[in-house]
Amino acid sequence: MSLDRKLHVVVLMGGWANEREVSLMSGEGVAKALEKRGHTVTRIDMDRQVAAKIAEAAPDVVFNALHGVPGEDGTVQGMLDLMGVPYTHSGLATSVIAIDKELTKQQLVPRGIPMPGGRIVQSEDLYQQDPLARPYVLKPVNEGSSVGVAIVTDESNYGNPIRRDAPGPWQEFRELLAEPFIRGRELTTAVVGGQALAVTELKPKSGFYDFDAKYTDGMTEHVCPADIPPEIEALCKKYALEAHRILGCRGTSRTDYRWDDEQGDDGLFVLETNTQPGMTPLSLVPEQAAYAGMSYEDLVEAIVEAALEHFAAKTGGNDGDQG
């Protein structure tokens, strides 16, 4: 596909979140794709003066290439709603819910989507006792890209209970989500334009699909399509579409899973749905789009077109909805 007119697009990237460097890579990839298609691009590195910079640029649309706070948690979405500027990806309410892993569970689990159990814990309490039986996972409530994730096992060198001086997310975050560790395989499915594209299996060479494994070339093998039974592929696509719909995502999203293949269908669990998935050359959404026959440039333009269509369908300047 190709947009029927040339646009002025602000690509919003960077910022101050842990995922700044990833966002810069995503944003630059998007900007080059748009320029290749003849669009005018203004690159803006997110800072406290971003509203004034966007107003001065006066774009047709903003491509939100930010990851993490404040570009993924509803802050930027609310600002752009108030400014009356069309923007890509999900809206304010969806972003607020999806970045919070506990709020996401409250939306998805009652509607039949399986997610790991667990609970919110105070980091200070970890130095007294484990919140769950080992092995378990500790992760920030409001971060993506496996930032700050720790797997606590009997063999880990964190101590038992965890030592105060042991390096881990408890040193950076006051609150963490503790979940049982699910043995098995890492799977993911992207949704673009209401279609679940494929299922990819991620095989990190480090043994865990962490931040470095995600964004360092050669650290993770991507198997697309995944070598999994047809019924698991169908379930992954079904859950990705349902999560996209229930949360009110738009444009694109990516749902991540752990699958204990010894448990069959019962071993598949949704970990999270990402409303701002990466758009770097290593990223999973472009990879699955290519598998589905969509070029990188077509993918970027499709996301922009979805944003413009949504904005045109709105009534008023601030939709305030989850779509």
From Swiss-Prot:
Biological process GO annotation list?
Answer: cell wall organization; peptidoglycan biosynthetic process; regulation of cell shape
Sorted alphabetically, the Gene Ontology cellular component annotations on this record are:
cytoplasm
Q: Which cofactor does it need?
A: Mg(2+); Mn(2+)
Cofactor annotation remark: Binds 2 magnesium or manganese ions per subunit.
Pathway, according to UniProt? Cell wall biogenesis; peptidoglycan biosynthesis
* Top EC class for this record: ligase
| Major subcellular location class | cytoplasm
Residues given in the record as Mg(2+) 1 binding sites: 256, 272
Enumerate the InterPro entries for this protein.
ATP-grasp, ATP_grasp_subdomain_1, D-Ala_lig_Van_CS, D_ala_D_ala, Dala_Dala_lig_C, Dala_Dala_lig_N, PreATP-grasp_dom_sf
Report domain ATP-grasp positions: 105-305
Q: Where does ATP bind?
A: 131-188
The record's subcellular locations are: Cytoplasm
EC numbers: 6.3.2.4
The UniProt record gives the binding positions of Mg(2+) 2 as 272, 274
Gene Ontology molecular-function annotations:
ATP binding; D-alanine-D-alanine ligase activity; metal ion binding
Q: Which is a Pfam family this sequence falls into? A: Dala_Dala_lig_C
Q: Which HAMAP family match?
A: Dala_Dala_lig
Q: Which family does it belong to?
A: Belongs to the D-alanine--D-alanine ligase family.
NCBIfam families, per database record: D_ala_D_alaTIGR, PRK01372.1
Name of this chain's protein: D-alanine--D-alanine ligase
Q: State the species of origin.
A: Erythrobacter litoralis (strain HTCC2594)
